Amino acid sequence: MDKLIKTISESGSFRAYALDSTETVRTAQEKHNTLSSSTVALGRTLIANQILAANQKGDSKITVKVIGNGSFGHIISVADTKGHVKGYIQNPGVDIKKTATGEVLVGPFMGQGQFVSIIDYGTGNPYTSSTPLISGEIGEDFAYYLTESEQTPSAVGLNVLLDKEDKVKVAGGFMLQVLPGASEEEIARYEKRIQEMPAISTLLESDDHIEALLNAIYGDEPFKRLSEEELSFECDCSRERFENALLTLGKDELQAIKDEDHGAEIVCQFCQTKYEFSEADLEELIND
């Protein structure tokens, strides 16, 4: 089971989250049949949203949209505060690597665009904010969003590593945030450690990458573990939800679908589950 560890420095001036999202991203790859670059881009977006959701209180729903003008199109993710996340990428078939190293490329194919966050607190007035994409690598764009939009200086590292068959090997990351009251001396120490930190891909290769991430963030500084939360890819779609969507079309449109197509098939964008509605099903909806 994937998990996210919340921590805070002994001084109370820094908080850090470290997470293992391997099964989450693996499930997303299997459901959407994504190729290498699309897998990494979608995976990074899911991890960013898992972090963002962990930062929320109450029963909120968080939508992250990474909207670029490159090959990927847009990437959409929806998370809740219970550790569930779902998502999809408009173009699942991007598969581009550096010839010399085999490194999967993301940034150049995200293009220019926006990192958008929509937080729905359940009150009917969702809060939307956005920042421009600064690199298209998603992790850097997420850190920029946190610093600029949420006014919290943040360092973020997240990645998805693939095996030789381009299947998800490991996925995860971290977020470090400066809290009010941090001294300049403390900030300088943490900045130095982040700058000298091994590459996120190297840390993810560790036997226990959550511990490796926390050790890299805190060094010898004492910190407290606040909580451990389970994470998973989970879609909340249902036949009932799509029945309600069909009802919004109106009886005339449903009759036309019944007469012309003799039924309907709806595919959930987030998990690719197919829902079949026969002529009899449509007739029942028409007569509802």
Swiss-Prot record:
Posttranslational modification: Under oxidizing conditions two disulfide bonds are formed involving the reactive cysteines. Under reducing conditions zinc is bound to the reactive cysteines and the protein is inactive.
CDD domains: Hsp33
Top-level lineage group: Bacteria
Disulfide bridge map: 235-237, 268-271
Keyword DNA-binding: no
Pfam families tied to this protein: HSP33
CC annotations in GO: cytoplasm
Molecular function terms from GO: protein folding chaperone; unfolded protein binding
Compartment(s) of residence: Cytoplasm
BP GO annotations: protein refolding
Keyword terms of this UniProt record: Chaperone, Cytoplasm, Disulfide bond, Redox-active center, Zinc
InterPro entries in UniProt: Heat_shock_Hsp33 (IPR000397), Heat_shock_Hsp33_C (IPR016154), Heat_shock_Hsp33_N (IPR016153)
Chain's role: Redox regulated molecular chaperone. Protects both thermally unfolding and oxidatively damaged proteins from irreversible aggregation. Plays an important role in the bacterial defense system toward oxidative stress.
Family per record: Belongs to the HSP33 family.
Protein name (Swiss-Prot/TrEMBL): 33 kDa chaperonin
Organism: Streptococcus thermophilus (strain CNRZ 1066)
Gene: hslO
